[in-house]
Amino acid sequence: MAKKCDLCGKGVVVGMKLSHSHIRTKRTWEPNLQRVRALVDGKPRRIRVCTRCLRSGRVIRAV
């Protein structure tokens, strides 16, 4: 399962977690993805989109 938005392409970002004693360990930031039924080329399909695309109106929901 890809952790990537089907519309904007937003995906996982890798960085470092920094503890109080400045020990660095790798960690990931994952986008807030939701599975929604949306119209893609005029047909309803289940796609995985981030909440920013949902809120901005880039998704046409299928009823």
Swiss-Prot record:
GO MF term set: structural constituent of ribosome
InterPro entries associated with the record: Bacterial_rp_bL28 (IPR050096), Ribosomal_bL28 (IPR026569), Ribosomal_bL28/bL31-like_sf (IPR034704), Ribosomal_bL28_bact-type (IPR001383), Ribosomal_bL28_sf (IPR037147)
Superkingdom of the source species: Bacteria
A Pfam family this chain is assigned to: Ribosomal_L28
Transmembrane segments: none
UniProtKB keywords: Ribonucleoprotein, Ribosomal protein
One GO location term (cellular component): ribosome
SUPFAM superfamilies noted in UniProt: L28p-like
GO biological process: translation
Ranges in coiled-coil conformation: none
Similarity remark: Belongs to the bacterial ribosomal protein bL28 family.
Name under which the protein is recorded: Large ribosomal subunit protein bL28
Annotated organism of origin: Desulforudis audaxviator (strain MP104C)
